[in-house]
Amino acid sequence: CPVAAQGRHGDGSWCKYKQMIPLNLPSFNIKTKVQGGRTLVFDFLRRRYVTLTPEEWVRQHFVHFLVEHKGYPAALLGNEVGLKVGGVSRRCDSVLYHRDGGRPRAIVEYKAPSVPITQQVFTQIASYNSVLRADYLFVTNGINHYCCHIDYEAGNVEYLREIPAYPELK
C-alpha cells in the first residue's frame, strides 16, 4: 500500500491496492482514498483524485520533488497536457511552462518503476518535444531519472547529472 507507513488511508480504511515499491525520490504525505473498490490519489496540480497506478505513483512523487525540493512553481506545472503529434492526439505526462507567455520550458515522461528506461522512452518524449520545443526533457520511472537540456541555436543536447533546481534552469 502506498501509505504503508501509516497502514491506513486518511479515511481510516485499509489499502486494497497492491504494494507500491519505494522510489528513489523523497517521500511525502500522499493523500489517498478508496472509492468504488479503486484506490485514488489526490493530484494537487489537477485538484482532483485520480486512479492510483504505478505510473501515477511516480508522477505524484516526482512533481512533489520538483515543487518541494527543487523550487519549481506549482502554478507553472501541468499534468496530462494534450497535444497532437503527427495529427494524433497524445498526452504529455507533465509540462513546466515559462513564466512569460506559457511556452513549454520542460516536459516530463513517467514510467512505472517496473518499466525500464529505454531508447523507446526517449523517442516518445522526443516526439512530444518535436511539437512542444521545450528546453529540458525529464524521464523517470521513479528509480532512475534522466534529464537533458536542448540548445536549439547550437544544435546540442546536453545530458545533466541531476535534475536542476528551478533557479538553475537556463
Enumerate the language-model features and the residues they cover:
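A short, conserved, highly charged catalytic patch centered on acidic carboxylates
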Residues: 20-136, 143-170
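Hydrophobic alpha-helical context, especially transmembrane and signal-peptide helices
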Residues: 1-3, 38
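Acidic, Ala/Val/Gly-enriched low-complexity intrinsically disordered segments
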Residues: 3-5, 11
